[in-house]
Amino acid sequence: PFDKDRDGFVLGEGAGCVILEEYEHAVKRGATIYAELKGAGLSADAYHMTAPHPEGLGAYLVMKNCLEDAGVQPNEVDHINMHGTSTPLGDIAESSAIAKLFGEHAYNIQINSTKSMTGHLLGAAGVIESIAALGTIIHGVVPPTINHFTDDEQIDSRLNFTFNEAVQRDVKVAMSNTFGFGGHNACVLF
C-alpha cells in the first residue's frame, strides 16, 4: 500500500474474533480488559461498484461518524490502521480523507496498513485489522506497512506512515477502517 508502483491487492486467508463484554460485567468477574470499544461508524457512498469517490467522501464520513459515536475529538487519535488495499485509487482517497478530517493532527497520527503483511482477507479483513489496532494499545508497537519503496506524489507525504519497520508508540486511542465493494464503509475506535 501507498507505494507509487502499487497495482492492487493480494488475497490472503484468515479469521478472527473479538469478544465484547459489558464493562461492569467484566469488572465484576475479574476479567482482563485489553481495551474498550469507544465507538463505531458506518457509511455508504455508493459512488462506484469497485472504486471509491475520488475525494474519499465515504472514508471521510465513516471516520467522522465513528468519532462522533465515540465522543472523541480528532486530536485524541494516536493510530489508524487504514483499509489500505494497495489500489491506486483507494489509497489516495483514504489518505485524502484522513488529511481532511484530522487537519494538522493527521501528521501526528501513526498510520499503517496491515494488509501489506496479511493480504486482503475479504470478510475477515475488518476483524483482523481491528485486532491489530488493539495490539497497538496493548503492546505499544505499531506494525509496519511493508514493501514500501517509492513515495506516491499523490499521497500527502506529511502523513506519518509506518513504512517497513515497526514503531514503538504509546497508543491510547486507535482507529481501524474497513471498506467494501459498492461503497460500504465501517470504522471502529478503541
Language-model features and meaning:
Residues V10, G14, V18, T32, ...:
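Conserved active-site and cofactor/substrate-binding residues in soluble primary-metabolism enzymes
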Residues T32-A40, N75-M82, I109-S116, P144-D152:
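Beta-strand segments within the central parallel beta-sheet cores of soluble alpha/beta enzyme folds
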Residues H25, H48, H83, H120, ...:
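Histidine-centered active-site/metal-ligand motif
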